[in-house]
Amino acid sequence: MTVRNILVTSALPYANGSIHLGHLVEYIQTDIWVRFQKMQGHTVYYVCADDAHGTPIMLRAEREGISPEALIARVYTEHLRDFTGFHIAFDQYYSTHSDETRYYAEDIYQKLKAAGLIAIRSIEQLYDPVKNLFLPDRFVKGECPKCGAVDQYGDSCEACGAAYTPTELKNPYSAISGATPIRKASEHFFFKLSDPRCSDFLRKWTRSGNHLQVEAANKMAEWLGEEGENKLSDWDISRDAPYFGFEIPGETDKYFYVWLDAPIGYMGSFKKLCTEQGIDFDQYWKKGATTELYHFIGKDILYFHALFWPAMLENAGYRTPTQIFAHGFLTVNGEKMSKSRGTFITAESYLQQRLNPEWLRYYYAAKLNGSMEDIDLNLEDFVTRVNADLVGKYINIASRCAGFISKCFDGKLVAGEDYQLLQQTVDEYFSSWQPGVIEAAYEARDFSAAIRHIMKRTDEVNELIHVLAPWEIAKDETRERELHRACSLGIQMFYLLSCYLKPVLPYTAERIEHFLNWMALGWPRQQAGQPLSTMLLPAGHTINTYQHLITRIDPKQIAALTEANRQTMTTSNDTHSLTRHAEAQQRVIAPIAETISIEDFSKIDLRIARILDAQHVPGADKLLQLTLDIGSEQRSVFAGIKSAYDPEQLKGRLTVMVANLAPRKMKFGLSEGMVLAASGESGGPFLLAPDSGAQPGMRVK
């Protein structure tokens, strides 16, 4: 086996708020993948850090009457506590407010400047004359210039959905001091992303080398534009004092924008680890490095990681990521997390309610498939699945067999001829097991496929134990050897299943290692042509007394959790603008279209359609060709959803189409209708999907 050298990162949580269950999707996903790779025997380092700079941190510290350094130190402790509670095993968890990150931020900036990729331009912004600072968009409020609604933010109106700049607001005021802002010009520093050296590199990098998922690469193609055009804009990388961050070298009262030094925090954190453990930093970061570098991120920050970041690294003489893995958002009970419903759940509250963190790790693993699709935490399904899969199926194997081994056989599994008979049973009954399928699913981050395969094998073990019925055999003293074989078989298969689940359930795996009296659950390796039985525990192996491993979820615990968060959040008055992502990506709602009559609407024939096939369209950057079943016939439709969907993931899905739209002749063929999808400034397209029970051909009314 070739040993791989791998560096893995998760996106840096902002040092201005609590970790919640939405954040944990990414850290659990990354941790599972890292643990799997380490079980393969590879050299893997997993680093992360608090994203500790920016205006929101500076202002919050001021409100609390403490220094920004004191604030980020406190939040760092809270974040690390929560991550540890969910068994996230970083090799290094650091802060961007560090000497290491400062060094690499300045180094990259100086190299970009020397390459002629830094430009200085004067821009006009709103300025708070009381606080003496320039106001980010979301720190300005006023009257909407379109509809006149009051108390609207500086970038968009929540009443009519209009988008605008802060300088267009009527009667603007500072959301910090209440003062009327003035217009003031200032010199800002820009990374010239539009330079052909960047745009040409990114066009090639995003489309080659499997650096991005298909959906992500398609989205990058949209942002880059068609061949021959350049839709990229230069990136403002500076902020004016007062600001909490790193000063730009050689400048006065100019600071690096938080999004410049945030990804550089990956380098700073790893450098800290290198210093502590004697690791060669250049082996992982120099241009041309043969080691592997993977970034796990949310799809909302794809723009920064797949455009700005690789362009900066390439032009500053560093290596670029091997791959960037983007995941979707978390919904709870099918809806956005809500403070009023108590579903905006913090990691701290989950742990304080004494819920097992591995329940959530398992549920997320069962949902994550390596794509950018959103995942839903359905709390009722959460209870059902954990209780049925983990307790009712998996743990049940050990609990039904271990007692007999300890009580009747002094903790020893079968040996000699009975061990050979056990091996024969394993190879005959479990011939369909495919350990390689589980391994491939973990490697591809398709944890849901891995869990499905493991649970199918778990069902097979339970079926055999049910047939053997050791609890019945135990009633007949003449069948002692048969009882010993049956229970030993259960324990042996429980051992294998535990090895496969160890990346997901690391704490339970440690307890199982004690129970099985086995130093460490390693990844079972089945050599080519070798039967499954060669991966079992040794003949005559002695186990320890069984102690209960995982308890069931009581639905009352979930009710208490949501109630605790509802009560906590109703007393919280944190402003919207305290998160970095509020600066990075704002939601703009399009205005409602002109009113139509019911007669006009009734002319539209909307039908449920099943996607029978989905294919790329040669020569089209944005289109997929869909073959739709609408009950009475099939239709071919061209849909502009290529940037968001892999064709293979669409097959079999239900959607909604306009069935009576006149066919449209396109250069790629005839489009016989239109599928419905949602999109906006914050993302999309998102294909509409009907509720379960809908059938192809049904009319939507």
UniProtKB/Swiss-Prot annotation:
Which residues bind ATP per the record? Answer: 339
| Molecular function GO labels | ATP binding; metal ion binding; methionine-tRNA ligase activity; tRNA binding
| EC number(s) reported in the record | 6.1.1.10
Q: Which reaction does it catalyse?
A: tRNA(Met) + L-methionine + ATP = L-methionyl-tRNA(Met) + AMP + diphosphate
**Protein origin, superkingdom:** Bacteria
**Quaternary structure and interacting proteins, as annotated:** Homodimer.
HAMAP family listed in its UniProt record: Met_tRNA_synth_type1
Q: Which CDD domains has this protein been placed in?
A: Anticodon_Ia_Met, MetRS_core, tRNA_bind_EcMetRS_like
What cofactor requirement does the entry state?
A: Zn(2+)
Task: Report the function annotation for this chain.
Answer: Is required not only for elongation of protein synthesis but also for the initiation of all mRNA translation through initiator tRNA(fMet) aminoacylation.
Q: Does the keyword Zinc apply?
A: yes
One GO cellular component term, please give it.
Answer: cytosol
Q: Where in the cell is it found?
A: Cytoplasm
Q: What is its main location?
A: cytoplasm
Gene name per UniProt: metG
How is the cofactor bound here? Binds 1 zinc ion per subunit.
Protein name (database record): Methionine--tRNA ligase
The residue ranges of the tRNA-binding domain are 600-701
- Give the first-level EC class, as a single word: ligase
Q: What is any Pfam family matched here?
A: tRNA_bind
The UniProt family comment states: Belongs to the class-I aminoacyl-tRNA synthetase family. MetG type 1 subfamily.
Question: What SUPFAM superfamilies does this protein map onto?
Answer: Anticodon-binding domain of a subclass of class I aminoacyl-tRNA synthetases (SSF47323), Methionyl-tRNA synthetase (MetRS), Zn-domain (SSF57770), Nucleic acid-binding proteins (SSF50249), Nucleotidylyl transferase (SSF52374)
Give the residue interval(s) assigned to the motif 'HIGH' region.
13-23
Keywords from UniProt, A to Z, are: Aminoacyl-tRNA synthetase, ATP-binding, Cytoplasm, Ligase, Metal-binding, Nucleotide-binding, Protein biosynthesis, RNA-binding, tRNA-binding, Zinc
Q: Work out whether the entry's keyword set contains tRNA processing.
A: no
Q: Where is this motif: 'KMSKS' region?
A: 336-340
Q: Where does Zn(2+) bind?
A: 144, 147, 157, 160
